[in-house]
């Protein structure tokens, strides 16, 4: 699973290598992704290498090699080369017998909805934002706050434990670009990292506050933070 920026960089590298036969320079990558510094490119390259999509080769200039592409990008590349791709597998569904629920069962399933599980979100030190659907999870319809898109994330870390959010919990997020003071939000920091924190406006700055005294509040400029959604529910497995 890759972030939007990781996908954008991998796509840029793949297209440039197909055209020129060599990878682009770090300056070209920085300009293509509209990043302020090459350090962001280094982090994206490292993430792509750790996930097995590219390989850095020692003692060679512009030493990058594409090992594999995500399925969606591979199909696009094959289409550009004029190759016919195989249709996606469609499973055959067999209807089973319908049984009555056990006595005393809560009528949750009847009002349950599937929402996309988008991967992990940091409740601690920010980790890479996830922008691809991993799978879907079923949640009670009453948990979804009115209209709008919703998605789920697995919590990684302990910075929100005093808000009742533990490592391994599944949080349900309503997708929205704004937040009120005190909301627990998914915040995208500098288009590279995502974190789950309480949101506060302080003058011209944004404070991302943990619910654990072991973590410091982060103060960032408004242009460094994008709200990706607001917490509306939580699922915990025992």
From Swiss-Prot:
<dbReference type="Pfam" id="PF00717">
    <property type="entry name" value="Peptidase_S24"/>
</dbReference>
<keyword id="KW-0227">DNA damage</keyword>
<dbReference type="Pfam" id="PF01726">
    <property type="entry name" value="LexA_DNA_bind"/>
</dbReference>
<keyword id="KW-0804">Transcription</keyword>
<comment type="subunit">
    <text>Homodimer.</text>
</comment>
<keyword id="KW-0378">Hydrolase</keyword>
<feature type="DNA-binding region" description="H-T-H motif">
    <location>
        <begin position="26"/>
        <end position="46"/>
    </location>
</feature>
<dbReference type="InterPro" id="IPR015927">
    <property type="entry name" value="Peptidase_S24_S26A/B/C"/>
</dbReference>
<feature type="active site" description="For autocatalytic cleavage activity">
    <location>
        <position position="159"/>
    </location>
</feature>
<comment type="similarity">
    <text>Belongs to the peptidase S24 family.</text>
</comment>
<protein>
    <recommendedName>
        <fullName>LexA repressor</fullName>
        <ecNumber>3.4.21.88</ecNumber>
    </recommendedName>
</protein>
<feature type="site" description="Cleavage; by autolysis">
    <location>
        <begin position="123"/>
        <end position="124"/>
    </location>
</feature>
<dbReference type="GO" id="GO:0006260">
    <property type="term" value="P:DNA replication"/>
</dbReference>
<keyword id="KW-0742">SOS response</keyword>
<dbReference type="InterPro" id="IPR050077">
    <property type="entry name" value="LexA_repressor"/>
</dbReference>
<feature type="active site" description="For autocatalytic cleavage activity">
    <location>
        <position position="197"/>
    </location>
</feature>
<dbReference type="GO" id="GO:0004252">
    <property type="term" value="F:serine-type endopeptidase activity"/>
</dbReference>
<dbReference type="GO" id="GO:0006281">
    <property type="term" value="P:DNA repair"/>
</dbReference>
<keyword id="KW-0235">DNA replication</keyword>
<keyword id="KW-0068">Autocatalytic cleavage</keyword>
<comment type="function">
    <text>Represses a number of genes involved in the response to DNA damage (SOS response), including recA and lexA. In the presence of single-stranded DNA, RecA interacts with LexA causing an autocatalytic cleavage which disrupts the DNA-binding part of LexA, leading to derepression of the SOS regulon and eventually DNA repair.</text>
</comment>
<dbReference type="GO" id="GO:0003677">
    <property type="term" value="F:DNA binding"/>
</dbReference>
<dbReference type="InterPro" id="IPR039418">
    <property type="entry name" value="LexA-like"/>
</dbReference>
<keyword id="KW-0805">Transcription regulation</keyword>
<dbReference type="GO" id="GO:0045892">
    <property type="term" value="P:negative regulation of DNA-templated transcription"/>
</dbReference>
<dbReference type="InterPro" id="IPR006199">
    <property type="entry name" value="LexA_DNA-bd_dom"/>
</dbReference>
<dbReference type="InterPro" id="IPR036388">
    <property type="entry name" value="WH-like_DNA-bd_sf"/>
</dbReference>
<dbReference type="InterPro" id="IPR036390">
    <property type="entry name" value="WH_DNA-bd_sf"/>
</dbReference>
<dbReference type="InterPro" id="IPR006197">
    <property type="entry name" value="Peptidase_S24_LexA"/>
</dbReference>
<dbReference type="InterPro" id="IPR036286">
    <property type="entry name" value="LexA/Signal_pep-like_sf"/>
</dbReference>
<dbReference type="GO" id="GO:0009432">
    <property type="term" value="P:SOS response"/>
</dbReference>
<dbReference type="InterPro" id="IPR006200">
    <property type="entry name" value="LexA"/>
</dbReference>
<keyword id="KW-0234">DNA repair</keyword>
<keyword id="KW-0238">DNA-binding</keyword>
<keyword id="KW-0678">Repressor</keyword>
<dbReference type="GO" id="GO:0006508">
    <property type="term" value="P:proteolysis"/>
</dbReference>
